[in-house]
Amino acid sequence: MLQTSILVSALFAGIVATLVTIAIERFGGRTGGVLATIPTTIVPAALGMYSISSETEFAQSMSIVPFGMMVNAIFLLVWIHAPQRWGLSLFGTTILSLLVWTAIGSVGLVASSQIQSSGFDAFTYAMSGLGLLIVLGLWATWTSRPAPKGHRSVRPMVLILRGSAAAIAIGIAVWLSGLSYPFISGLISTFPAIFLTSMIALWLAQGQDVPQGAAGPMMLGGA
């Protein structure tokens, strides 16, 4: 049962990750960015976790997902502002965004565990995270940014690599859920594999304007 849940969840995530780049490429940053955040990766991850977790553990895993998406929004803010403000290259922006995600995610993971251990309701905690995510997404998209369509196709090998990265992240999340690490599995299920590979693939194929134009709508769509 565990292996089946992992494989199905990972396969769905990999397929969606591949389609996201194509959506942004075809429809432009605004429409494609929102399409990229349709919850077709967290749904199979949630189904996989539900099938192998207790009710309490599943609630704990899901309660941290809005916080994880908020961390992803901050991750995307790095991609919007770091290249212009600090003149970072694609490599530098990638490293900085991952460091920011790891640092904030780690602090939030510890805080989430302690807050809910003290008796704070999982649903209320999740709704608090959702509220913060919506505010952050609105703030990031309040000022319109250029969101051009792509003019060059992303190479098939890049699509395969990004689909594989997303599949691995979701597979690990479901596996950790089976080991009774609900908070860790919930956070890992939101690891920005799709966002990261979208940014890298589109930057390489189209230049930095296309992925930066998509980042804001991705943040708001994640809510």
Task: Go through each PLM region and give its residues.
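Structural signature of hydrophobic alpha-helical transmembrane segments
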Residues: M1-G14, A36, T56-I74, D121-I134, ...
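C-terminal transmembrane helix-loop-helix hairpin of multi-pass membrane proteins
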Residues: T4, S164, W175-F191, F195-A223
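C-terminal ends of transmembrane helices
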Residues: V16-G29, I74-S89, W139-H151, I200-V210
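Cytoplasmic-side transmembrane-helix entry/capping segments in multi-pass membrane proteins
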Residues: R30-T40, W86-V100, F123-L130, H151-A165, ...
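A generic, lipid-embedded transmembrane alpha helix
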Residues: A36-I52, A103-S106
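Membrane-interface helix-loop-helix junctions at boundaries between adjacent transmembrane segments
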Residues: E55-F67, I74-M127
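Hydrophobic core of alpha-helical transmembrane segments in multi-pass integral membrane proteins
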Residues: T102-I104, A126-W142
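Selected transmembrane alpha-helices and immediately adjacent juxtamembrane segments
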Residues: T143-F183
